[in-house]
Amino acid sequence: MIRHALGLRLDSSRPVRDQIHEAARLGARGVVLEAIGDLSPLRLSETGRRELRHLLRTMELSLVALSLPTRRSFDTTDQLDDRIRRADLAFALAYELGTNLVLARVGQVPPEDDRERREAFTNAISSLGQRADHRGVRLALETGSEPGQRLKTFLDSLDMVSLAASIDPASLLRGGIDPVAASRELGTWVAHAYAGDATGSAGGAAPNPRGLGFPAGALDWEEYLGALEEIGYRGFLTVWPDPSEDPRVRFTTLALRFKRFG
């Protein structure tokens, strides 16, 4: 039985309000927005924020999460104060718009023997966690090309309730990492999960970590959903279409797939 509502991550290069209407028509229960462009905390006025909240309520859509745009890893102190300040503004915006979850790609956890980068990364994420806690939100670190156990160990070491993990099967598969194993390894740290794989990815995918029986980039959906069930994840499954594809086709295809597991 599929216990997860489906969400849709919207494309920041397209008009947001049109996409919200489209998401509702498709049957999505929530959306993920990116804090960039017209939705940047520095550009979205108080009136704009009220109108956006009203539109989401009218369309009966939840704001699953707000995505924090990041251009580089947090393993360097270069312009760190400015980056943390911008993140803090996004945390405040997320809370005001009605979600307590912010997603961000912060880069790989540096190895412990790289002391300088590891210390910079640890201090930066700790600072972000403190800011998130102050704003009443959680910061979910998006999985990428590192094993789930490595991220879990790092999160365990910080032990901050304002930090979490977001499972991105497509990114993991492109890196040759099994999303099923990563989900189980991260366990209760998982606060958000995507529904998608890396088949047809423009960037290509590594050999499938589940063996020769699975094409490159393909996700073992039944095992993935089972792993999320095992760790007690009850949140949204967010569909994140590639900008080059029709989001309606992507969402509908996955919605039909999940019905077969119902």
Sequence positions of predicted segments:
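Soluble or luminal CAZymes and related metallo-dependent hydrolases
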Residues: 15, 44, 48, 82-86, ...
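Active-site acidic/histidine proton-transfer and metal-coordination neighborhood
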Residues: 14-21, 55-58, 74-165, 174
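N-terminal pre-domain/capping segments
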Residues: 1-91, 95, 99, 257-262
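Histidine-acidic metal/acid-base catalytic patches
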Residues: 1-5, 13-29, 148-163, 167, ...
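Active-site-proximal loop/turn and secondary-structure-junction residues that shape catalytic pockets
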Residues: 10-14, 35-37, 69-72, 106-110, ...
